[in-house]
Amino acid sequence: MKQLKKQHEEILKAVVGAYLTQKNEISSALLVKNYGIKFSPAKVRYLMTALEDEGLLVKETKSSGRKPTNKGLEYYAKFLSNAFDLKLINNLEKIFLNRKDNIYNTIEEVTKELASLTGATFVTKFKDPNLILKSINLFEVSESLATIILVVSNGEVLSRKIDIPENKAIKISDLKIAMNIFQDNLIDCKLIDLEKRILLLKDILAEKIIQYEDVIESYVKSILGIGIKSQIYGRENIILSRKIAREDVNEILNILEKNSIWDALEKNSNDFEEIRISINSKGAFFSKRIDENNNLTEISVVAPNESDSNSIKSGIMLLTKIITNNINEKEKDKNERKHS
């Protein structure tokens, strides 16, 4: 997304802030009178017209006012909003930041509160670094479909489908050969290392399977997300929202339950973005990934597209602070025990 000039950013920020408060089209006179804009109304109108030409504002009626488009809301959320809603952060930090409770209980309480305060739906995904694969088997369903059954060290039995696309030259027999190799080499492997370990077996697979790369791709794709503890908070905020189309609700919930918002936003994001953001006709999507000491966590938020991105980003950063503090404390305790 192209960076705007400072003057244009100032006007866009004021328009979005005013619109989120008033939910009406915003005029140049209102910005000058109530929002601290120092330009003349004529200059403001000129800048608003330029923002309209960029697709960031739109005039829907014959009035002189304009409202932000989804593109304008996304630009605001990415570049102009902040993650320092002090009232929200301070109130929750006092309660939760230094709590010695189980981290999952703390995250659950904080996230429930954030979902209630922001009217958004929060999703947390934790990848447990200690889970180990104890058993893995393949069961043929049809010529193009099989099921992988995995047993994990915490007693969970996980099931994953593995499809054979029509454009691939692999067969079920290839998957069975690969499974025999996996059973010999992957048992007692940590789940967080499973994808890496499968890739390391490529030379062995290549000796027995012609299309070994397609086989590896099929298996890796099917086991993505294994060992991740996922929880949705404020589900009702999506279901009951009048600002999200009914036909979009099921699609959004399916994405939240089965996919990574972080990965879904990758195409339109830059590597340097701390929080990935996309705002479109379906809603507003935010995601942050924390990867410290093999503790992979994803925090994602879905809300109506006209939601307050300041509060949402502040909530994400508060959760990040609580999680990283917990990880660092654990590492500190581990190192102290090691040297005691």
Swiss-Prot record:
InterPro entries: HrcA, HrcA_C, WH-like_DNA-bd_sf, WH_DNA-bd_sf. GO terms for biological process: negative regulation of DNA-templated transcription. The keyword Transcription regulation applies. It holds the Pfam family HrcA. Belongs to the HrcA family. Negative regulator of class I heat shock genes (grpE-dnaK-dnaJ and groELS operons). Prevents heat-shock induction of these operons. GO terms for molecular function: DNA binding. This is Heat-inducible transcription repressor HrcA. SUPFAM superfamilies: GAF domain-like (SSF55781), Winged helix' DNA-binding domain (SSF46785). Gene3D superfamilies: Winged helix-like DNA-binding domain superfamily/Winged helix DNA-binding domain. It comes from Mycoplasmopsis synoviae (strain 53) (Mycoplasma synoviae).
